[in-house]
A protein has these predicted regions:
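Residues immediately within or flanking Cys/His clusters that coordinate Zn2+
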Residues: 11-12, 30, 68
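Short cysteine-rich clusters marking metal-coordination/redox-active sites
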Residues: 14-17, 33-36, 74
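Cys/His-rich microdomains that often coordinate metals
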Residues: 21, 39-40, 78
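Short linker/helix segments within small regulatory modules
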Residues: 22-32
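A short beta-strand-turn-helix
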Residues: 44-62
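Thiol-based oxidoreductase modules, predominantly thioredoxin-like and allied folds used
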Residues: 46, 66, 78-104, 111
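Short pre-active-site segment immediately N-terminal to redox-active cysteine/selenocysteine motifs
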Residues: 59, 66-70, 113
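Non-catalytic, surface beta->alpha helical segment in thiol-disulfide oxidoreductase systems
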Residues: 113, 118-155
Length: 158
């Protein structure tokens, strides 16, 4: 991991006390407000050079948003994803990947349409959702993905 990746930070306003906090893209555990100590929404951007450090090695489940600047549905679903990250502060990390800036990641994860959402658990894809959806649908999908066993723990039907 380069020093640039380790030093990259996002400013997040605490939904509990309103204090602005600098949250690193890469860290162990979950970010907490420096003022009130509540868990903060963890939202980061990643590209080809730092995706492994930011998303695949995260200590909590990661909701990955593959999006593009020219994509209308991507812009429509972005506030819903940020809402989910806020609702599940300390439980998930939201990582946004611009497919035009990271085409190799799009190929690697077989992204054929944007937006496409993935849930990574232990660095493995646990769930996939293509296309925009209302926040209630995304919330249910995310909750299902978070409650299922890890891909490596899934048992074959008998």
């Amino acid at each position: 991991m380069t020093a640039d990746v380790a030093a990259r930070r996002t400013v997040v306003t605490c939904p509990h006390c309103g204090k602005r906090n600098r949250v690193p893209s890469v860290a162990d555990g979950v970010p907490r407000c420096g003022n009130c100590r509540h868990s903060l929404p963890w939202i980061a951007e990643a590209g080809e050079d730092d995706f492994a450090a930011v998303a695949e090695r995260a200590s909590i489940p990661v909701l990955v948003d593959f999006w593009a600047t020219w994509c209308g549905p991507c812009r429509m679903v972005s506030p819903a994803l940020e809402q989910l990250a806020t609702e599940r502060a300390g439980v998930i990390k939201l990582v946004k990947v611009d497919v035009d800036r990271a085409p190799a990641l799009g190929q690697r994860f077989q992204i054929q349409a944007v937006p496409t959402l993935l849930v990574l658990r232990g660095g493995e894809v646990a769930a996939r959702q293509a296309g925009a959806a209302p926040v209630a649908v995304l919330r249910r999908w995310l909750d299902d993905a978070l409650t299922e066993s890890k891909p490596s723990e899934k048992k074959e039907p008998s």
